């Protein structure tokens, strides 16, 4: 698996993250989300139960052959060793690794042999994006998010979009956006320069639990931009 097909797809990439139940995962798939995310960082509010993780993984694999566009499972990690990430990725059948800490993504990608989504904080981490060789974009997807992630903190979208435009709008620098996204504002986010996809967790929850209506509406509103 690589990001080539995702980057060349007609519509935006939509990821629903922080999934902790088979019901929510099925809803995300039924809504046509492209990426399903599970938190593999120990001790977090949205950390997935190992049994549920494997059930979601089996569901994604089963749907991959029956849906018009392939769906992939993303495991989110933060400052965990390469060995731990590889073990969990193998146990859960993860397709894409998302690194949400200070990990050197190229080192991890080479060790894991999996595509990587790398969380970047704006403007601190822009140099990481600028220094990424264009030939690596099939293995690397940048994601602008807050430092902690999953907090609902709204990023300064306009500054990020303006920065991308200042670079000349290069396709190799296109990125996913997270932070404060909701069914109500996702369409606006996808109008910004450089945004190739969106990543949501808290924005599709009610009282800390995944809300099926919000998942459906979020994906539907995002896909309207295709």
Curated annotation (Swiss-Prot):
Q: In which pathway does it act?
A: Amino-acid biosynthesis; L-tryptophan biosynthesis; L-tryptophan from chorismate: step 3/5
Q: What GO biological process, any one, is recorded here?
A: L-tryptophan biosynthetic process
Q: Which GO terms describe its molecular function?
A: phosphoribosylanthranilate isomerase activity
**The EC number(s) this enzyme carries:** 5.3.1.24
Lineage top rank: taxon = Eukaryota
Indicate whether Isomerase appears among the record's keywords.
Answer: yes
- Asked if the Swiss-Prot or TrEMBL record annotates the protein with the keyword Iron-sulfur, the reply is no
Which catalysed reactions does the entry list for this protein?
N-(5-phospho-beta-D-ribosyl)anthranilate = 1-(2-carboxyphenylamino)-1-deoxy-D-ribulose 5-phosphate
Q: Which UniProt keywords apply?
A: Amino-acid biosynthesis, Aromatic amino acid biosynthesis, Isomerase, Tryptophan biosynthesis
The record ties this protein, via HAMAP family, to: PRAI
Q: Which family does it belong to?
A: Belongs to the TrpF family.
* Protein name (Swiss-Prot/TrEMBL): N-(5'-phosphoribosyl)anthranilate isomerase
Which organism was this protein described from? Saccharomyces kudriavzevii (strain ATCC MYA-4449 / AS 2.2408 / CBS 8840 / NBRC 1802 / NCYC 2889) (Yeast)
Source taxonomy lineage? Eukaryota, Fungi, Dikarya, Ascomycota, Saccharomycotina
Gene name for this UniProt entry: TRP1
């Amino acid at each position: 698996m690589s990001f080539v097909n995702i980057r060349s797809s007609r519509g935006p990439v939509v990821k629903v993250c922080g999934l902790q139940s088979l019901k929510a995962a099925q809803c995300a798939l039924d809504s046509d989300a492209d990426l399903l995310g599970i938190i593999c960082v120990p001790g977090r509010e949205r950390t997935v139960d190992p049994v549920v993780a494997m059930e979601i993984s089996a569901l994604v694999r089963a749907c991959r052959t029956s849906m018009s566009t392939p769906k992939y499972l993303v495991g989110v990690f933060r400052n965990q060793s390469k060995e731990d990430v590889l073990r969990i990725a193998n146990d859960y059948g993860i397709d894409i690794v998302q690194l949400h800490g200070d990990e050197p993504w190229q080192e991890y990608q080479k060790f894991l042999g999996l595509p990587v989504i790398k969380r970047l904080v704006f403007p601190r981490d822009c140099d990481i994006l600028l220094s990424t060789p264009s030939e690596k974009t099939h293995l690397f997807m940048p994601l602008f998010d807050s430092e902690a992630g999953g907090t609902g903190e709204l990023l300064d979208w306009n500054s990020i979009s303006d920065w991308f435009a200042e670079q000349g709008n290069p396709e190799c620098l296109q990125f996913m956006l997270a932070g404060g996204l909701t069914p109500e504002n996702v369409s606006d986010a996808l109008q910004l320069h450089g945004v190739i996809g969106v990543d949501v967790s808290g924005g599709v929850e009610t009282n800390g639990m995944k809300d099926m209506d919000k998942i459906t509406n979020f994906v539907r509103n995002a896909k309207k931009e295709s």
